[in-house]
Amino acid sequence: MFSYEMHLHCSEVSKCGTSKAEEFVKSYAELGFAGIVFTDHFIHGNTAISRKLPWEERMHAYFEPYEKAKCYAKELGLDVIICLEHAYGNGKEVLVYGDITPEILAAHPEIEKMNIKDFIGFCHENGWFVAQAHPYRKRDYIDMSVPPIPELVDGIEVYNHFNAAEENVKATQLCEQHDLIAISGSDTHNASVCGNAGVVFNKRITNGKELANALFENNFKLIINGEVV
């Protein structure tokens, strides 16, 4: 069995991150995880990448900070996959998993002005898996009057380690009501808080394409509060 963290933020790419990518690599390797999926904040979120950069340069800048961490991860036998978390307004976000490259993103500057329906359509055209992140999280920056979008996504993050228990319960109910695929992610921003969430596959996942395919297959278990269920 192969455990993967599905939701984390490093300080090089997300302003809210407090640990560097290499620190996460070390922590998850020590915990025995097979891999981690970086889901840092994209263009409309709390990104550390300058919005003043030209589009193509900005897309490449989003990926560059991971290169050193990927080399370190290879030494430790840990898979590192680069995906993203996309904010679409009112504090709402989706997690996107797949073969996401700076070349694909750089070729489509229209992404920046897409509404969420068109953005998810673009993701699906590329074979990417889209999950609603923490759909019932209560924070000052989130407009709770704006409902989730189960009709557009492929899955729901039913367990987020930093959500209240009732928020995760409601997310699970939403997922079941719409017959969507359940995923789990810690949403950690610090390498000292790791291993409490994720998914467990029955095979090694080495890249974004394999990850999206495995998620669509829906043949995996979840890590919830540190336990495989």
Which residues does each PLM region occupy?
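Internal catalytic-core helix/loop-beta-alpha segment
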Residues: 108-142
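An N-terminally biased module of ancient metal coordination in phosphate/nucleic-acid-related enzymes
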Residues: 1-88, 149-151, 169, 190-192, ...
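Flexible loop residues that form catalytic
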Residues: 41, 135, 161
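Charged catalytic cores and adjacent phosphate/nucleic-acid-binding surfaces used
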Residues: 1-14, 20-26, 90-103, 121, ...
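Conserved beta-strand positions in the central sheet of alpha/beta enzyme cores
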Residues: 36-38, 131-132, 157
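Surface-exposed amphipathic alpha-helices with a cationic face
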Residues: 3, 29, 70-74, 117-131, ...
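Glycine/small-residue-rich loop that forms an oxyanion/phosphate-binding "nest" at active or ligand-binding sites
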Residues: 82, 103-106
